[in-house]
């Protein structure tokens, strides 16, 4: 089943010029893509290529300058109030900047309950039980429930944001560089959790990243973005190779997992 369909999406931002006239800076240009239930897809590209702008459009935080975004066959622009509430539950996003994504005055307990209060019909006791369950799923314990964001490490807060997104059992989870910053052990644990959710609920995942290793470990398909356009789409197999210049640049930039020892005869 197709969850998300994007057709000919373009977006620009207006900036004031010295002459007083607005100048338009194009960020996305004719982007089209689809995501299906249970699918794991990566959007790969260097910083500034338009990935994060696209993610904001996909979750409805901004409206595109041109083109259409459909969720389960319905255009986002035409959703009624009840449909929009269901959409906000079905599609959740975890941002790279976790500090800006939470209220620093709220406790972790309040942060986790927030989407459940607004999007689910659960009693308070059920919300608290699920909050604890989601914390354990991301390798945190109940001792953080009464803490506030400034009292947590960056990795802990990122996992709190992930737990908050998972609490409403979304159909699509968008992770904007949200896993790349975790250490390898935590990253592996999060990936195991996401795979479990896919098996149980058919949750689709869109990884917005520059981390090719993450793509190779977890994703089924990868789209390469460059200068606001998707320039290549590849299935992820044992040997992932790119045909686009942007894809090859990203692949060549990856360091080996372990340092390569020089032979004794090699000159330094």
Curated annotation (Swiss-Prot):
GO MF terms, alphabetically ordered: ABC-type nickel transporter activity; ATP binding; ATP hydrolysis activity; nickel cation binding
The segment(s) forming the ABC transporter domain are: 4-252
**Could you tell me the membrane topology recorded for this protein?**
Peripheral membrane protein
Write the record's keywords in alphabetical order, separated by commas.
ATP-binding, Cell inner membrane, Cell membrane, Ion transport, Membrane, Nickel, Nickel transport, Nucleotide-binding, Translocase, Transport
Reaction(s) catalysed (UniProt annotation): Ni(2+)(out) + ATP + H2O = Ni(2+)(in) + ADP + phosphate + H(+)
A UniProt-annotated Pfam family:
ABC_tran
Under Enzyme Commission nomenclature, its number is 7.2.2.11
The cross-references to InterPro entries, in alphabetical order and at most eight, read: AAA+_ATPase, ABC_transp_ATP-bind, ABC_transporter-like_ATP-bd, ABC_transporter-like_CS, Nickel_NikE, P-loop_NTPase
Function, in words: Part of the ABC transporter complex NikABCDE involved in nickel import. Responsible for energy coupling to the transport system.
Its name, as the record gives it, is Nickel import ATP-binding protein NikE
Gene, per the UniProt record: nikE
